[in-house]
């Protein structure tokens, strides 16, 4: 029963991760399923789809087509849509319905590539995992589909800078501006990367890891093509309300590991000497964790963790976490889209 949430909403699913990870690329995104799963992406998890809304399509498979397994109707519609929408390649994300009826993704890829003449990637997402699993999977598929040996250039790839991982447009712009002082070309996979940029991914001097989701891909690129990687280091804006902090007080940062680790680094740089811990409801890399850090499985884990740590003077996290207490002085609101979605972020 540990996965029964009584006070928190369900977390962003793997297909939301796929859609968010590639929504700014020059690709046609197809989310295959019925209205319920689609609503989770379009109304809760997708904060930036307005920029490329015309390239995100939902099949909204009907009950009769589900029962009869009528894939042909949907495939024909995808082909027609691909003729009207500019794109370099197609990515299809699954949901619980395709899983239940046993959709043959390999056949879909084969038929759509033959009919459209464009590369096609099918993601066997089911909605049972959280968003970062979808991001990891689609990044690896992009590497598998488009990577090839090319001549090295003075360029850099930024991978994992998605809105579900806490990256805003301003944050991306600042990181790119800093990197442009050192490199001739800076390619953010979350900023209109087309097929030409992806096919040159192995020409990079270095890859920048913007979230934990990027780790498997950058490690594969290092292993296969010798492209090193480093963690994104961007000077983050001061957390609103941080001025109330006692510099010797204990602080808990709840959120995506790369960003929260950067906040921790900045706290220490600014003279904070108290205990600073990072925890997250989504994947964390053990190598980046310090004593007291924790990967949380759900709200019961969070309550247990706060008790084990005897609470903190200050907690920085999504507003929905304030109800659990665990802080002696102040709770600072830093919304996490993958946790609360539009519920609080639109306010």
Which residue ranges define each predicted feature?
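An N-terminal assembly and electron-transfer interface module characteristic of large anaerobic redox
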Residues: 1-347
């Amino acid at each position: 029963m540990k996965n029964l949430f009584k006070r928190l909403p369900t977390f962003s699913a793997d297909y939301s991760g796929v859609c968010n990870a590639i929504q700014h690329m020059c690709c046609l995104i197809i989310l295959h399923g019925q209205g319920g799963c689609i609503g989770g992406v379009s109304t809760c998890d997708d904060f930036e789809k307005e920029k490329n809304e015309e390239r995100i399509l939902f099949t909204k498979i009907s009950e009769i087509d589900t029962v009869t397994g009528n894939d042909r109707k949907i495939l024909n519609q995808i082909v027609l849509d691909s003729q009207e929408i500019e794109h370099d390649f197609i990515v299809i994300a699954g949901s619980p319905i395709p899983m239940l009826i046993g959709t043959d993704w390999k056949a879909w890829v084969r038929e759509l590539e033959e009919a459209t003449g464009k590369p096609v990637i099918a993601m066997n997402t089911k909605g049972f995992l959280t968003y970062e699993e979808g991001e990891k999977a689609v990044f690896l598929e992009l590497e598998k589909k488009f990577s090839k040996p090319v001549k090295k250039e003075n360029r850099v790839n930024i991978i994992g800078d998605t809105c579900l991982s806490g990256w805003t447009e301003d944050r991306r712009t600042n990181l790119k501006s800093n990197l442009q002082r050192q490199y001739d070309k800076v390619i953010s996979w979350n900023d209109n990367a087309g097929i030409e940029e992806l096919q040159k991914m192995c020409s990079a001097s270095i890859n920048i890891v913007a979230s934990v989701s990027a780790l498997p891909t950058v490690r594969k690129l290092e292993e296969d093509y010798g492209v090193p990687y480093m963690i994104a280091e961007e000077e983050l804006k001061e957390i609103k309300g941080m001025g109330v902090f006692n510099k010797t007080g204990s602080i808990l940062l709840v959120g995506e590991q790369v960003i929260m680790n950067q906040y921790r680094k900045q706290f220490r740089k600014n003279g904070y000497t108290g205990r600073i811990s990072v925890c997250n409801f989504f994947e964390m890399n053990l190598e980046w964790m310090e004593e007291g850090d924790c990967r949380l499985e759900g709200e019961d884990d969070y309550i247990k963790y706060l008790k084990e740590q005897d609470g903190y003077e200050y907690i920085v996290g999504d507003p929905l976490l304030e109800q659990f207490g665990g802080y002696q002085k102040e709770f600072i609101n830093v919304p996490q889209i993958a946790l609360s979605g539009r519920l609080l972020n639109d306010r």
